[in-house]
Amino acid sequence: MKKVLRNSFILTLLMFLFSIPYLYYFYYAYLARMTVFSFATETEVYMIGFLELLGLVLLMISVCSLIGFAGSEKLGFKGWGDWQLIKDSLQKILLFGIIIALVTYISKDFHLLNQFRSYYPSSVILLLGIPLYISLFKELCARFGLVTLFAGVFKTKQLAVILAALIFAIAQIAVYQLIGVLPQFNWLLLTVLMGELVVSIFLGDLYLKKGLGMSLAVSVVANLRLMLLFFF
């Protein structure tokens, strides 16, 4: 138990430091689009909202990391996986990442790219870290946390992967709607939802079979498209 708590604390601390610049920037970018908000008069409200968002993200990461470290290997999963296997599977990681990037581009990016561009940071340093940060957050929460939790509760790996994928896909749609993207229920929303589901189910299955390190590596490769789309 001490090892689980120690690993969870270290991971949460690292993600806390990693989260600050990105959450601060994206929260600022979101509020900047809200015409009802005045930074000159409501700075205190802005900071309170940012701290609440940071606290929520850290709570999710800490809970999911605890679940993952405590239950992953206990349930017979690969945990973080074999790092040597990851090194030996670079071609597969690249291939899977490219396929996921294409699926995501066709189902989401192609339709929403212009709306997402306003949220891209102007700092190249921040931009370079986006694929890693997004991948870490998604894999820790959706795979390490939710898949492990549901597998422990329902005793069925396949159901755990599907439920985790469904919940995370719906959560992402809710975030898009919150920031003004996909405000209405239409065919485009369904297309994005199905794309998110397919990708999440694949990554969930990869996590079960090969470990979190493998699903994380594939996710990072797929999310590199975010930088390419910014420049092109």
Can you name each region flagged by the protein language model?
Residues 6-11, 85, 114-122, 166-174, ...:
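Hydrophobic, membrane-facing alpha-helical anchors
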Residues 1-15, 81-94, 213-218:
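Alpha-helical transmembrane segments and their helix-start/interface "positive-inside/aromatic belt" motifs
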Residues 125-232:
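Transmembrane helix-loop-helix hairpins at the membrane interface
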Residues 6-22, 92-100, 161-167:
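Alpha-helical transmembrane segments
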Residues 37-55, 187, 191:
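Membrane-interface segments at the starts/ends of alpha-helical transmembrane spans
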Residues 12-35, 101-109:
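Alpha-helical transmembrane segments of multi-pass membrane proteins
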Residues 60-73:
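Central hydrophobic cores of alpha-helical transmembrane segments in multi-pass inner-membrane proteins
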Residues 39-43, 47, 70-135, 147, ...:
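Juxtamembrane helix-loop-helix connectors linking adjacent transmembrane helices
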